Amino acid sequence: MKVTSSRLIEQKKPILKQLLDRLLQTYSYASILMTDSKGKQYTISKQGISITENMFVELGYVVKVYDGESYGEYAFSHIDENEIDSVAEEIKNHVMPWAKKLPDDMKVKQYPEIPDEAYHFEKSTDYEVLPEELGDEEIVKRLGAVREKAMAQDEKIVEIKTACVYQIYHKLFLSPNKDMTQNVMWTNGMIMGLIPKGEEMKMAFDSCSGCGGMEILDDMETKIPPLVQKLNDLATSEPITPGEYDCICAPDVTGMIVHEAFGHGVEMDMFVKKRALAEKYIGEYVASPLVTMHDGAAAASETATFFLMMREHLRRIPSSLIKES
């Protein structure tokens, strides 16, 4: 099934279109982004059961306008039809005159107008089990069953913690030539265990994630055997002798290393400060010729998946951070 659209966005869209028309009377370019989301986090451990709101939920609006020289943005959390003029006046009187407040020795950099190719769509991700239909009680029951099953695997295990978090978010983007809506649901599942090793406590962790609903609870059960194996391996493990080693990593570990080293390592401030070691490896071999690492919202159906971009065609093309090593 597809994630349905937001009723609030459907209600506010005609008002936002009126606001856009009002802004375009003053500015050559204007756009409006609306976000409406909801979600919960469930956690079960020895300490008890916790149900909280997902920390990433949000509701609000952002307007961007261009005055022929620079851009200004204005964020607000509520709008009705009788507030259209007041929002437009707030932008005109308090947002765009920002350049007048600059020191005399500072100049305003001129920016070109954003290309506004025509795109009109509404896209949604798929799911099998809607969290709200399953209900809090059943979700907690299923998470508790996963925890109890994991605890029963080995009497040496002193704690198992299970958690599940989901978010359903909706975004609407309007500009003179764009009318784009996305409806996305993502879910994360986590299972963590503790086992003693002498006076130490060793911890193992596993997780699953993706676009979808509470069908992820089935995936969490499959994480129990490897988690228990990790815990037992850690309980009998010995520290590695300090030194330099050539390591063969699992793909998920390699991905994390590449993210940290070549993602954060190529941030512009690191280049300017001559702190980016990655600068020396651009164009060089950094992995096996078998390795190609993709990036971008279209690379996988995951928690970072999205459809809505200023230039939507770019989203459909996964970029390659590493191509054939």
Predicted regions and their residues:
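Acidic, glycine-enriched loop/beta-strand segments at the rims
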Residues: 310
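Active-site bordering "gate/hinge" segments
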Residues: 1-305, 313-316, 323-324
